Amino acid sequence: MARVYMETMIQKCVSFSQIKQLQSHFLTAGHFQSSFLRSRLLERCAISPFGDLSFAVQIFRYIPKPLTNDWNAIIRGFAGSSHPSLAFSWYRSMLQQSSSSSAICRVDALTCSFTLKACARALCSSAMDQLHCQINRRGLSADSLLCTTLLDAYSKNGDLISAYKLFDEMPVRDVASWNALIAGLVSGNRASEAMELYKRMETEGIRRSEVTVVAALGACSHLGDVKEGENIFHGYSNDNVIVSNAAIDMYSKCGFVDKAYQVFEQFTGKKSVVTWNTMITGFAVHGEAHRALEIFDKLEDNGIKPDDVSYLAALTACRHAGLVEYGLSVFNNMACKGVERNMKHYGCVVDLLSRAGRLREAHDIICSMSMIPDPVLWQSLLGASEIYSDVEMAEIASREIKEMGVNNDGDFVLLSNVYAAQGRWKDVGRVRDDMESKQVKKIPGLSYIEAKGTIHEFYNSDKSHEQWREIYEKIDEIRFKIREDGYVAQTGLVLHDIGEEEKENALCYHSEKLAVAYGLMMMDGADEESPVRVINNLRICGDCHVVFKHISKIYKREIIVRDRVRFHRFKDGSCSCRDFW
């Protein structure tokens, strides 16, 4: 009876002071000798929201010979803490303690599970193989729940080869195993493989869960495959908040922001802050700042407290629309509302000021930050320095980027263009030499387009497509027509020391141009209202931006491009970004 009473008392602890009082009572009443009650108290202290992990460690130090449950409580606490890597340190200490013949603690499935979750959170890939070996050595590989946790940890650490191997070796695969690998493939930018696995799961008769649907919709978002996304979302009720959030995100990222808003409006359950944030972000990246900010302003009226993501979405809307004063007001309001600013908030404001030509203010904000600025902030300043031909600021930003050890090909191009605009050709040559000496590699451009139910991929100068000859002929046709319309190639974007004609040729076979050309081919005779939709893995280049404006006017076809920053809607010779990107 005493044990039941004390366990009830532990469960009733709702503050740290109550936990401390109970611990004192344990010591004086002798309950500390009960391993069951002791481990329950440790768990309450280590993992409850009102507990204190450091105090749990102090309690642990009082134990002369900690048992398995005592160790597990501490490891579990660190796994869910802000320092998950410490869980692996405790695991190694436990492993050392359990190796002696007189040990009374043993690493069990729960120990491994908690440590794996810590490794997944800390992205501690070096520990994964060690844990995998221990699982096999201790005969725990038949534990399907533990194997799924291991699979999830491999996936989150980006080791998809090991994840696939483990998945194929598992004697029993439940829906959680499939979900872990599908989600891992999506986060590892292997969305096509994720969709193949999702379809294989359906073929094998595995009933999908809510988590499956969210992961699959994420894959569709990456691929821009709205048709498959609609098929997956079809049949779900309008009150499932997690799936509806994923559907809003999917529609937005596939370029159908009005359909996203339809899901948002028709949702019958209680909208979470994530629901609102997803919709605000959707409008923001589509350049519909006023609709985004209108929803942002409704948050508190609907009983939702804006969080850091809400403010980031609002700042993103201001950033894409050039709403400088409103953006600064949103940024300054964060402190009044008790919302802590992070690097992304500063990044939005720096980009907003920079693109408005207020480079000194942007520079001052970077220098006054309480945290160390990341390279993205300086890259925003460098990009704006090119727009406004500010050599001094470009050199400052470039120097800061280099000191951080970042060698991005785009940064070299921007600095070179600033020098070229001032006729400083020796400096242009120096930048090129610096780029070559550092062996800077360009990230290959990759674009997707969906045509007749199939996703097609294109790389720069790609000739792997079965219709590449027809696509290149279409490119030649486009080049002829846009030249007649006044197009001049932006050859300054090409850093290589080659002739102007070769530079123009290098520009005309960018992946997004190949995708648009293919889209135009596939839409011959199609409804004029149907746009060409392309997804690009990089920020759209200035030349492609100009070309697509000409194409939209000449071919009377809307072109929608999602790059890594935002959506661009080209129609009748202009872009929704108003050349502010």
Swiss-Prot record:
Keywords: Repeat. Residues 453-483 are annotated as: Type E(+) motif. PPR repeats lie at residues 67-101, 108-142, 143-173, 174-208, 209-239, 240-270, 272-306, 307-341, 342-372. Residues 484-581 are annotated as: Type DYW motif. Residues 377-452 are annotated as: Type E motif. Gene3D superfamilies: Tetratricopeptide repeat domain. GO terms for molecular function: RNA binding; zinc ion binding. It comes from the Eukaryota. One of its GO terms (biological process) is RNA modification. It holds the Pfam family PPR. Belongs to the PPR family. PCMP-H subfamily. This is Pentatricopeptide repeat-containing protein At1g34160. The lineage of its organism: Eukaryota, Viridiplantae, Streptophyta, Embryophyta, Tracheophyta. The gene is PCMP-H68.
